[in-house]
Design a protein with these regions (language model features):
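Charge-dense, helix-prone N-terminal extensions
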Residues: 1-138
Length: 138
């Protein structure tokens, strides 16, 4: 797996592991579990550290992993373009681009459906549809 986003001599993967350890509660466990599912869904995923949060990429950003007091939020950057038959997306539903999964303490996310969503995001990024179109100059 490639690593990107090194900071202060630490790789992005090390910074993500550090964040998980610092959380030390259900949020750290949840973020760790979701990280494992992302890696299982895409062995070529690139871990990055941006905006003080974990970011997983493959030909573009797949999702970020944010931790707040009451939730762990996985924001899919092109989520509005993805099919979500399992209805995992439960946040940021009104926008034209992003979709998010908010996970509260005690909640479980369907692992198979989540991995399918990650694979779909990778396929979308790799298709070139995720790249902004270039406007013609007049």
């Amino acid at each position: 797996m490639k690593k990107s986003g090194a900071s202060q001599g630490q790789s992005a993967s090390e910074l993500i592991s550090k964040r998980i350890a610092e959380l030390g509660d259900w949020r750290g466990e949840t973020l760790s579990r979701m990280r494992k599912l992302i890696k299982a869904a895409d062995p070529n995923v690139v871990e990055e550290w941006k905006w003080m949060n974990p970011v997983w990429s493959h030909d573009g950003i797949i999702c970020t992993g944010e931790s707040y007091k009451n939730i762990v939020k996985l924001t899919f950057f092109k989520g509005a373009s993805l099919k979500d038959p399992a209805r995992l997306f439960n946040s940021s539903l009104d926008g034209n681009v992003r979709r998010a999964i908010d996970i509260h303490e005690g909640e479980e996310v369907d692992a198979s459906a989540f991995k399918a969503l990650v694979r779909q995001a990778v396929a979308f990024n790799s298709s070139g549809k995720a790249k902004p179109s270039k406007k013609a100059k007049s």
